[in-house]
């Protein structure tokens, strides 16, 4: 009797087909129309360590402006579909829509190079572990000292049409079956958040939430002890399917360790006994094994600058090749090489003839200067059924902004019109206006820059435009033509002049 037995070999089924993400070059046609747009001089001045607040209502009198902050510029562009072009024959508004493509950018930075320092008047520093003078095994009640330092050196320029994504270590939630006692080490969790204007960069102490992970507020300098230091999540932004958050980025980081210290306080996790041989006398008790360094960014030089230079976008790292969806662009800038903190002094009394410290008040300020220049290329999209379906799956608000949909039927019904519209005998005739479109990014803080009225087709009138024409091999259109100069009329003379005879050589 023959029986059918199932095969024991493993059978692999093909995966379920998914929609493929394509490059914007597949459905975006570029034109030969270019525009220049630039900001005015952008300035920011404030206190480098903390905001100055009014004692009564905590109103910020002086904002916090530090060279260790992210500057996230949200660039608002005009709608090209409502743009006034001298010649509109290059596209069909019934079947096509226009978009901007960023092809050139230059981030200008003013102010001289300089190194800004920070510190803490009560930093948790126990001993100098690099050059220890004595074995400090028993710490006192309060060993905090006044320590200052410079930070890690960072230069960053990141461009996309969506806000940049950052990462940092925060306090996680323990499992419900784990008992948590006061003083236990909190669990860590990698958190992704949007990088906003004014967020602190990694200064050399790690990308972490110092507010929740350092309870004594004395582990790091003043400007970050109650802040979150974020680091751009390049891995997440590069792996984004549509590539909107990161067209390209420029990055330069450097750091070395200047001093080596250890922390005061009870050691939460003791050194295992098998890692050392117990001592006697002053070494009977182990010193604190919680070591930490003070970072330093070393020398700043103009030879290693990534700013004040033009950059041309030929091919983006993702599928979005520079298309500015939603008519907006995000430029994220970090430059710690111009982080000088200016010291200001104001005299309380000018009648004293002998110097006294109490006669003067000292202040700190930090100033920043930016200038953003762009070259945008006009592009058109033919709205076929496949393209519209793809764009709707990518971002449904794009088609809504284009006002692309079914037209309402003509109004053929009879309408009622009352004479006394304010009478209480009839229903209210006041129509409620439609609610304005809500900004999906209104809960975030950005440096808003409006370029809707700063587009110009005269590229040769701007420094970045002339650089673009030179590298692209294009010529600016002449404004006027020079004709041949006419000969000046001469008065006729009655006397005849003898013609010069030709002579053979």
From Swiss-Prot:
Which GO cellular component term is one of those annotated? T=7 icosahedral viral capsid
Q: Which UniProt keywords apply?
A: Capsid protein, Disulfide bond, Host nucleus, Host-virus interaction, Late protein, T=7 icosahedral capsid protein, Ubl conjugation, Viral attachment to host cell, Viral penetration into host cytoplasm, Virion, Virus endocytosis by host, Virus entry into host cell
What is the recorded post-translational modification? Answer: ISGylated by host HERC5, this results in dominant-negative effect on virus infectivity.
Determine if Disulfide bond is one of this entry's keywords.
Answer: yes
Checking InterPro entries in the record gives:
Capsid_L1_Papillomavir, Capsid_L1_sf_Papillomavir, dsDNA_vir_gr_I_capsid
What subcellular locations does the record give? Answer: Virion; Host nucleus
Which Gene3D superfamilies does the record match to this protein? Major capsid L1 (late) superfamily, Papillomavirus
Q: Name one GO molecular function term.
A: structural molecule activity
Q: Low complexity bias located where?
A: 488-497
Q: Where is this region: Disordered?
A: 480-505
Q: Which GO terms describe its biological process?
A: endocytosis involved in viral entry into host cell; virion attachment to host cell
Q: Which family does it belong to?
A: Belongs to the papillomaviridae L1 protein family.
Subunit: Self-assembles into homopentamers. The capsid has an icosahedral symmetry and consists of 72 capsomers, with each capsomer being a pentamer of L1. Interacts with the minor capsid protein L2; this interaction is necessary for viral genome encapsidation. Interacts with protein E2; this interaction enhances E2-dependent replication and transcription activation. Interacts with host KPNA2; this interaction mediates the nuclear localization of L1 capsomers. Interacts with host ITGA6. Interacts with host SDC1; this interaction promotes efficient infection of keratinocytes.
> What other facts are recorded?
HPV16, in comparison to HPV types 6 and 11, is more often associated with malignant genital cancers in humans.
From the Swiss-Prot or TrEMBL record, give the protein name. Major capsid protein L1
The organism's taxonomy opens as: Viruses, Monodnaviria, Shotokuvirae, Cossaviricota, Papovaviricetes
Q: What gene makes this protein?
A: L1
């Amino acid at each position: 009797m023959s029986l059918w037995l199932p095969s024991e070999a493993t059978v692999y089924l093909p995966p379920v087909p998914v929609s493929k993400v394509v490059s914007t070059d597949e459905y975006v046609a570029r034109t030969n129309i270019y525009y220049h747009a630039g900001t005015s001089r952008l300035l920011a001045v404030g206190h480098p360590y903390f905001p100055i607040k009014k004692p009564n209502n905590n109103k910020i009198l002086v904002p916090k402006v530090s060279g260790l902050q992210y500057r996230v510029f949200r660039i608002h562009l005009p709608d090209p579909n409502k743009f006034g072009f001298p010649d509109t024959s290059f596209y069909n508004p019934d079947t096509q829509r226009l978009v901007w493509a960023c092809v050139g950018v230059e981030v200008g930075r003013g102010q001289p190079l300089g190194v800004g320092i920070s510190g803490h008047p009560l930093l948790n520093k126990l001993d100098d572990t690099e050059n220890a003078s004595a074995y400090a095994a028993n710490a006192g009640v309060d060993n905090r000292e006044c320590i200052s330092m410079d930070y890690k050196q960072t230069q960053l320029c990141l461009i996309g049409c969506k806000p940049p994504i950052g990462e940092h270590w925060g306090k996680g939630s323990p499992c419900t079956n784990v008992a948590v006692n006061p003083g236990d080490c909190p669990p860590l969790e990698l958190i992704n958040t949007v990088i906003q204007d004014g967020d602190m960069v990694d200064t050399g102490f790690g990308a972490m939430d110092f507010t929740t992970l350092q309870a004594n507020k004395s582990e790091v300098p003043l400007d970050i002890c109650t802040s979150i230091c974020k680091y751009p999540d390049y891995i997440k932004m590069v792996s984004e399917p549509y590539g909107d958050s990161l067209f390209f980025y420029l990055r330069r980081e450097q750091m070395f360790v200047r001093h080596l210290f250890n922390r005061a306080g009870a050691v939460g996790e003791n050194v295992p006994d098998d890692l050392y041989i117990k001592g006697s006398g002053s070494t009977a008790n182990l010193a604190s094994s919680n070591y930490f360094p003070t970072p330093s960014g070393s020398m700043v030089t103009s030879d290693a600058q990534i700013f004040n230079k033009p950059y041309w976008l030929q091919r983006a790292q993702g599928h979005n090749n520079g298309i500015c969806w939603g008519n907006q662009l995000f430029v994220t800038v970090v430059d710690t090489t111009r982080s000088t903190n200016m010291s200001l002094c104001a005299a309380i009394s000018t009648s004293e003839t002998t110097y006294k410290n109490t006669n003067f008040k000292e202040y700190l300020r930090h100033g920043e200067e930016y200038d953003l220049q762009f070259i945008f290329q006009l592009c058109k999209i033919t709205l076929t059924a496949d393209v519209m379906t793809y764009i709707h799956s990518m971002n449904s608000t794009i088609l809504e902004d284009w006002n692309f949909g079914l037209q309402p039927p003509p109004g053929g019904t009879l309408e009622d019109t009352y004479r006394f519209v304010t009478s209480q005998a009839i229903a209210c005739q006041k129509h409620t206006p439609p609610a304005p479109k809500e900004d999906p990014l209104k809960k975030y803080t950005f440096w808003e820059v409006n370029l809707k009225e700063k587009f110009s087709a005269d590229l040769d009138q701007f420094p970045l435009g002339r650089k673009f024409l030179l590298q692209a091999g294009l010529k600016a259109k002449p404004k006027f033509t020079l004709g041949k100069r006419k000969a000046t009329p001469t008065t006729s003379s009655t006397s005849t002049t003898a013609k010069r005879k030709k002579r053979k050589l």
